[in-house]
């Protein structure tokens, strides 16, 4: 299976540079795997397509303002992208860096607000280990000085509105450097209406990493090595999923991050055990889903691992037909774009 088989043409004007005025005002494409039909609606009406007894599984990760800017001792500008905090007493992070000239261990980067970053070592296969030191807790400093890490395809700097809109309303656990975008469409009022309809919710955590934006650098899909991301599933969520299955309800994954976490943590029979760890599951056509019965997701980049997961869930031909139809009808694509519900 070749990566180029997952390519498609998208006019630039269909890339959503900004979110819709209202979270739940996005369009919603409706796919039914059994009938092969394609329908259309608004996201705020998703309750009409869910059933009492269904369980929405949400990713409650919180996006950190992971983009930082500093200066080397020479005055050269450095851009830092936080990836993952290391499990050490010191405030050490694996990072990606961009600089006019190469970096080396031992260099000190000066940041705003009396914060410095020491370059500790080069990491393989890419990135750097930095140690941050300042007069106040790093987390407090970061919330004030960091910039929201918008996807590169938005081709614009982060603005004040992104602090709110590039974050789900149920975000709790800080650690992601990319939003679980399917969750951006939900409002507290919509979640309340779903609960009144008998649709339950449960949360897990997957801290989305920068690999979600990185292109596949291989020709064959099966040769790709996917990035790992930290996850956590509670005993309460595992129990809710088991009880939903026993009652005949559907487990509806909100986003590819929730779907990957559920499938990674499941055993051969679809059973789940609570726990934490690093998820590195790569789902592409041919994979048999063990837990997920329905999926809420956005429209994804060509040749991405995300469109491969959606193709595995609904069938590649069906998904690409839906994508072409969405482009023809002027749907908005990518992180701030419209959504689809696949059942």
Curated annotation (Swiss-Prot):
Keywords assigned by UniProt, alphabetized: Cytoplasm, Queuosine biosynthesis, S-adenosyl-L-methionine, Transferase
Catalysed reactions, as listed in the record: 7-aminomethyl-7-carbaguanosine(34) in tRNA + S-adenosyl-L-methionine = epoxyqueuosine(34) in tRNA + adenine + L-methionine + 2 H(+)
Gene Ontology terms: biological process: queuosine biosynthetic process; tRNA wobble guanine modification
MF annotations from Gene Ontology: S-adenosylmethionine:tRNA ribosyltransferase-isomerase activity
Cytoplasm among keywords: yes
InterPro entries: QueA, QueA_dom1, QueA_dom2, QueA_sf
Primary location group: cytoplasm
Gene3D superfamilies per record: QueA-like (3.40.1780.10)
Keyword Cytoplasm: yes
GO cellular component: cytoplasm
Pathway(s) this gene product operates in, as recorded in its UniProt entry: tRNA modification; tRNA-queuosine biosynthesis
Top EC group: transferase
Localization per record: Cytoplasm
EC number: 2.4.99.17
Superkingdom of origin: Bacteria
Family: Belongs to the QueA family.
Known function: Transfers and isomerizes the ribose moiety from AdoMet to the 7-aminomethyl group of 7-deazaguanine (preQ1-tRNA) to give epoxyqueuosine (oQ-tRNA).
HAMAP family assigned to the protein according to its UniProt record, in alphabetical order: QueA
Subunit structure and binding partners: Monomer.
Name under which the protein is recorded: S-adenosylmethionine:tRNA ribosyltransferase-isomerase
Annotated organism of origin: Pelobacter propionicus (strain DSM 2379 / NBRC 103807 / OttBd1)
Lineage: Bacteria, Pseudomonadati, Thermodesulfobacteriota, Desulfuromonadia, Desulfuromonadales
Encoding gene, per UniProt annotation: queA
């Amino acid at each position: 299976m070749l990566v180029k088989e997952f390519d498609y043409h998208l006019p630039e004007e269909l890339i959503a540079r900004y979110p819709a005025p209202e979270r739940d005002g996005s369009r919603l494409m409706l796919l039914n795997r059994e009938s092969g039909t394609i329908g259309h609606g608004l996201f705020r009406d998703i309750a009409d397509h869910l059933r009492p007894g269904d369980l929405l599984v949400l990713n409650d990760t919180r996006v950190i303002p992971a983009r930082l800017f500093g200066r080397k001792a020479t005055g050269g500008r450095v851009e830092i992208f936080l990836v993952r905090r290391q499990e050490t007493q010191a405030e050490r992070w694996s990072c990606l860096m961009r600089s006019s000239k190469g970096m080396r261990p031992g260099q000190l980067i000066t940041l705003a607000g009396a914060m410095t970053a020491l370059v500790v070592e080069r990491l393989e296969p890419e990135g750097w280990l930095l140690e941050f030191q300042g007069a106040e807790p790093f987390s407090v400093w970061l919330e004030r000085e960091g910039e929201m890490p918008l996807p590169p395809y938005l081709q614009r700097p982060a603005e004040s509105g992104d602090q709110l809109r590039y974050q789900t309303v149920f975000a709790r656990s800080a650690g992601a450097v990319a939003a679980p975008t399917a969750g951006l469409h939900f409002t507290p009022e919509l979640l309340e209406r779903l609960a009144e309809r008998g649709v339950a919710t449960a949360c897990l955590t997957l801290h989305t990493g920068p690999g979600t934006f990185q292109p596949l650098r291989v020709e064959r899909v099966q040769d790709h090595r996917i990035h790992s991301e930290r996850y956590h599933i509670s005993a309460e969520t595992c129990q809710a999923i088991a009880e939903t299955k026993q009652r005949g309800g559907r487990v509806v994954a909100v986003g590819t991050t929730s779907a990957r976490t559920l499938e990674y943590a499941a055993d051969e029979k679809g059973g789940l055990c609570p726990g934490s760890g690093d998820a590195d599951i790569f789902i592409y056509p041919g994979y048999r889903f063990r837990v997920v019965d329905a999926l809420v997701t956005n429209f994804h980049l060509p040749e991405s691992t995300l469109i491969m997961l959606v193709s595995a869930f609904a069938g590649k031909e069906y998904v690409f037909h839906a994508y072409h139809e969405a482009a023809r009808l002027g749907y908005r694509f990518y992180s701030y774009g419209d959504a689809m519900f696949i059942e």
